[in-house]
Amino acid sequence: VPLARQFDWVWALLIWATPAVIGVVIWIYLGKAEKEENARKEREEPINKEVKPIFSDNTRIWKSGLAWQMATFMALQSFVFYVTLSWLPEILHSNGFSESSAGWMLSFMQIIGLPASFLIPILADRLKDQRKIVIGIIIGMLFGFSTLLFGHSAIMMVVATAIIGLAVNGNFALALTFFGLRARTAKDASSLSGMAQSLGYLFSALGPVIIGAVYDVTGSWTTPLIIVLVTIVLLLFMGLLVGRDRYVLD
């Protein structure tokens, strides 16, 4: 919103497109380099005529209870994450912030969450049991969204936004870290990641739509925020299961 008002929506959207263009250029370069490296290895290594099975043993991942818990955790945390990105400015606007200020607050939330995105995976990797991290993150989420629901002062809204930024970004990073922590091999981690992220993002994509529809029906952010708080409580239960020291396919 701030950039759109200063320039127009075209330039505001182009700013977001810039990192994507840079990413595509890097991806093309790395893809060519990898292709050349694979070709070199094929020339140097003897041909392996061993026939590999069509279906991997890791299809067992779909029968793993821990894998389904991971998928549910991923779905719930992504639901909260994308609802926050989509509707936080509107919620702040309804609490007295101008459209421009609410837009800047969303940027503030994402920037202040960067340290958590870097530090949470490091901390989680040093611990065998990550349940205390989950509890800390959930407390932050509950405080932040409860403040959005019941708070009225601008200062409290800023504090809530900061805490939400730390919590949701930290939780997103923790969810991705769990794929490596809950698998004994890279192959298992890949299978777990593919399953959990596919199902998780499929569900979470409905989050902003559902919350927006509820707001349209009720005309208030009270019920949508209650739905988010209930989702966070469910996320706590899933996090306590996933955070235990164990491995998928064991």
State what each model feature region is.
Residues V1-K35:
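Helix-loop-helix hairpin linking two adjacent transmembrane segments in secondary transporters
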Residues K32-M70:
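Juxtamembrane intracellular "pre-TM" segments in multi-pass secondary transporters
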Residues K63-I120:
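Extracytoplasmic gate region of multi-pass secondary transporters
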Residues G170-R184:
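Intracellular juxtamembrane helix-capping segments at the cytosolic ends
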Residues K132-T147:
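Structural signature of the two symmetry-related core transmembrane helices
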Residues R5-T18, I211-I232:
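A membrane-interface helix-boundary motif in multi-pass transporters
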Residues A183-T222, V228:
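A late C-terminal transmembrane helix in Major Facilitator Superfamily
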Residues A4, A116-D129:
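Helix-to-loop junctions at the C-terminal end of transmembrane segments
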